[in-house]
């Protein structure tokens, strides 16, 4: 079923264009853009011939570079070409991207304490050391 397929290139372009139009002149970074699946009730009604075809939607996570921790979530209706939901989300971190992970690995590989810890266990070639970043929530306990 088409509306359960991932976004096409044209749909991706349409979603990003709507977001850019809304944010004209603001310093925003796209963190994540994907298909927003229809609600199960909408899907079942359509499959059973009891409801209309669900609209195609995209879900986006955006980073507002001007605001520390500024994360925005948006739902874009690609059928009607409107942004249906737009909300700032507090106390969250955006999804780690491959760019973020590469940066973390470069920083860790060049950190003197990490280098020494590796040498202490017999590892001298830091290009052979890999790091896996995890997004862990801060816990005050």
Q: Could you tell me what each predicted segment is?
A:
Residues 1-7, 49-55, 64, 77-80, ...:
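N- and C-terminal low-complexity/disordered segments
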Residues 25-78, 125-141:
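Exposed beta-strand-loop-beta-strand "reactive/processing" segments of non-cytosolic proteins
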């Amino acid at each position: 079923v088409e509306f359960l397929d991932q976004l096409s290139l044209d749909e991706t372009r349409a979603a990003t264009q709507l977001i850019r139009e809304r944010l004209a002149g603001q310093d925003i970074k796209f963190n994540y853009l994907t298909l927003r699946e229809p609600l199960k009730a909408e899907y079942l009604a359509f499959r059973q011939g009891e409801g209309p075809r669900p609209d195609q939607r995209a879900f986006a996570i955006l980073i507002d570079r001007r605001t520390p921790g500024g994360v925005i979530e948006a739902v874009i209706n690609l059928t009607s070409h409107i942004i249906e939901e737009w909300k700032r989300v507090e106390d969250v971190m955006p999804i780690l991207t491959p760019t973020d992970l590469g940066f973390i690995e470069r920083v860790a590989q060049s950190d003197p304490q990490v280098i020494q810890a590796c040498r202490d266990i017999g590892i001298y070639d830091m290009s052979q050391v890999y790091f896996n970043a995890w997004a862990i929530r801060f816990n005050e306990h």
